Amino acid sequence: MSIVFSDRFRYTLVVSSYKERIFLKHSLIRFSAVVLTIAFVFALTGCGSGSNSFTWFVDCIPANLDPQVASASADVIACENLYSGLVRKDPSGKYEPALCERWEKSSDGLTYTFYLKDGLTYTAAKGNATDYAITAEDFVFAFRRLFRAETNSPYAVEFAALENSAAVLAGQMPESALGVTASGPLTLVFHLSSADDNFLEKLTLPGAMPCDEEFFNSTRGTYGLNASSSLSSGSFYIYNWTASGLFLRRAPSDSLIDSLRLVQNTNSAGQSAAELIANEKCSAAPDDTAAPTTLTSLSYSDTTWSLLFNCSSVFASTELRQALASAARGAAEVPDGGLYAAANGLVPDGLTVDGMNYRDTAGDVTPAAVDARALYLTARQTLTTSDFNKVSLMVPAGSGVTSAAEEINGVWQKEFSLFFSVEEVDEETFAKRLAEGDYTIALAPISAEGGSVYNMLNQFTAAGGGLTGYADSLYATQLQASTQATGSSRCRLLGDCERQLLNDAVAVPLFAQQKRLLIAPGIQNLIFDPFGPVLDLAYTTKE
């Protein structure tokens, strides 16, 4: 079973084989696209209220089903099952038509022409048919919405290669200048300013789903915010949407899952993932323990525990950070319990950027060996003993990393005669102080939200939250440049940023935290995104 993590909003875990089901707006169907790439094939069993139902616990009930803006995990899960796009991937990773009959790509890679299927329409709530046909104009309107500043779409960055996209987003050119045009009701043409080898991959993202302009305008600002202002072009339709959950259905067909329940775990909060599945409270569940289980499990990692130095404190000194970082690397053993592994960088192994393995493309980011003692002595020339009086190493209680923090602290005492306290605080306090910069050193979990390398690195910029108070114009410039690049160029720019963070000892990656999805036997053809988490049940069956 191979795992590939994507630098977008999902990664797909494909269980068994696909069988596409597509539903009917003004003239086409849209298959709920898989937004990230991690392809697996395995079997799962769903539990729920019906014989062919699937229940998934969400942190919060879906609130926004507008595919051009959906980014919260529950919203993306819903969009995954409500909408279809131009193309989709089969289990082998090959792209195949979804709402289109076929497509053509120019020899220079700058023009893509899609020929849409005829006669497809959107489906309203309760499975009611509509007269809204899916046409090429729906895709034109959807992409124009992506590049409206007021939309604030998280997907715009993925389509930076579209002709005039930056100028349209900045308001310097009209929407009509965007490189997406309709040549008739069923012919859609994309014009790129630079070739993007992963353009088809990006067309599986929610933001690339069709949007009927007439229907959108009729909702008067409530598009995707309630059942009556939403239309389905994918596998499922909205059956009910209340404060209790979002309930999706489709017409029964053999062993296909025909009911998807997105609800909160309100009555079984004390049960483990394995217990929830065994007690038929849910059909699959993420698990962050290493407890033995007979259930099928899928392991992955999106989090790296790292030492963080607050650059607004005494650790504004790069030499001091580098000295302590050098001594800390390898000082702590990987915590027991099976949840952790030694980190190879800040970005977890397995993530991809534009379909490319990030780590393989970006290369090794391990800082070169340094003379830690010499760096420390250089730093001390501008520091006094009193500068270290309030330094502590903050860790979250119950995380299992306190012993590692104490080992590192012991090495600093031995190597530099620095006596810091290890400060263990509850999880809520830890998160609050980290966000407010109220710490000097912290051993903290740094996550790649949505499986995105960019999102992970952006946390170290002022615009992204200023996690450590690090302010470097080169870092910010290169990270911003990565949003305009694609493929290997994007990987290299992101790799340079990661390398700079580690060389400057802003963050010192220590342990990759392992997670897993637990699944009960019997469910097949499930597409799973551990970073959302996102589930696509278009082809999921229950034996």
Q: Where in the sequence are the language-model features?
A:
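Long beta-strand-rich cores associated with HINT superfamily self-processing modules
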Residues: 517-543
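Aromatic- and charge-enriched surface segment that lines or borders ligand/interaction sites
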Residues: 102-158, 315-316
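Extracellular/periplasmic solute-recognition and catalytic clefts
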Residues: 239-249, 258-312, 334-335
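N-terminal lobe/hinge region of extracytoplasmic solute-binding protein
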Residues: 57-107, 151, 231-232
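Alpha-helical secondary-structure segments
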Residues: 137, 189, 302-353, 389-401, ...
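Structural transition elements
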Residues: 338-381, 398-403
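Extracytoplasmic/peripheral linker and loop segments enriched in polar/acidic and small residues
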Residues: 419-430, 455-521, 543
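Gly/Pro-rich hinge or "lid" segments in bacterial periplasmic/extracellular proteins
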Residues: 173-177, 184-186, 191-264
